[in-house]
Regions:
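Anion (oxyanion) recognition and catalysis
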Residues: 30-32, 83, 174
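N-proximal low-complexity "stem/linker" segments adjacent to membrane-targeting elements
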Residues: 1-43, 48
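Short beta-strand-to-loop acidic/aromatic patch adjacent to the donor-nucleotide binding site
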Residues: 63-74
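Active-site nucleotide-sugar/metal-binding loop of Leloir-type enzymes
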Residues: 51-65
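Short, high-confidence coil segments that cap the C-terminus of an alpha-helix
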Residues: 62-63, 87, 178
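C-terminal catalytic/acceptor-binding lobe
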Residues: 146-243
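Conserved catalytic core of nucleotide-sugar-dependent glycosyltransferases
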Residues: 76-154
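A short acidic, amphipathic alpha-helical/loop segment
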Residues: 24, 52, 78-82
Length: 243
């Protein structure tokens, strides 16, 4: 008999849940392809909350995957499909905004040990990374059975945080041979002052429009037609300006 995968789904919150997230959660719970247990943990601080969640998950002996969703993240309604990729650690593409810059949590570590955003504008589908966020994450049971103290910040000798619990968790898991994945076709929204998902989609659209325009210019240039067309465009602009 086919055994459904059992998912312990935790919606981390501080006493309230957004309406749009509640709608997605309701849709998720109607998916009968999986056995789903839902919890709403609200302990503080966040590292304590996550580690308590892990212990409760491990106590459920037949649970296969832990999924955690933060209350400011709106995943896609089909987010449970990530379980079927059978990866150690997998997330949708998540985004943060720092000083007005949109940053994808799709990170690879360079030779200097610095995390850089991968080329998410060019790539699609399932991609292996060195680090991702924990705002919406699916973790296989074997990972949490082996990673000790999974969620903890790292501080320097002066007590200043130098590594967040999300990146630290990824580092610990990778040291034990587990792999971290991000699926770029699943884009979660991150609600702050605005929808970061909408900003991301606008950026993707602009990127591909610019790329297509560049390719057209290259073809025209190779055919010796670019200068003539640009000259005609400038004439039209000047004509409109003089009206």
């Amino acid at each position: 008999m086919f055994k459904k995968k059992k998912i312990y789904l935790c919606l981390l919150n501080q006493g309230e849940i957004r309406t749009d997230l509640a709608k997605v959660l309701n849709y998720i719970q109607q998916n009968d392809s999986y056995e789903i247990m839902v919890s709403y943990p609200a302990s503080k601080p966040i590292t304590n909350n996550r580690n308590m969640i892990v212990q409760k998950f491990l106590a459920i002996k037949d649970a296969d995957y832990l999924m955690m969703i933060d209350s400011d993240i709106i995943p896609t309604p089909n987010i449970l499909n990530l379980v079927d990729f059978n990866k150690d650690i997998i997330t949708p593409l998540m985004l943060v905004q720092q000083k007005g810059t949109l940053i994808p949590l799709y990170l690879r570590r360079n030779a200097d040990g610095i995390y850089d955003a991968g080329n998410y504008l060019e790539e699609t589908g399932l991609q292996e990374v060195d680090a991702t966020g924990t705002g919406c994450i699916v973790i296989k049971r074997e990972v949490l059975e082996k990673v000790e103290h999974p969620f903890e910040n790292v501080y320097d000798r002066d007590g200043i945080k130098k590594l967040g619990n999300d990146f630290n968790f990824c580092q610990k898991a990778k040291k034990l041979g587990f792999k971290v994945w991000v699926h770029l076709d699943y884009v979660a929204d991150h609600i702050s002052d605005c929808s970061l998902r909408e900003m991301f989609l606008d950026k993707i659209k602009q990127y591909h429009n610019d790329k297509e325009l560049h390719q057209i210019k290259q073809v025209l240039k190779e055919k010796g037609q670019l200068d003539t067309i640009l000259e005609e465009v400038n004439k039209l602009k000047n004509k409109d300006a003089n009206k």
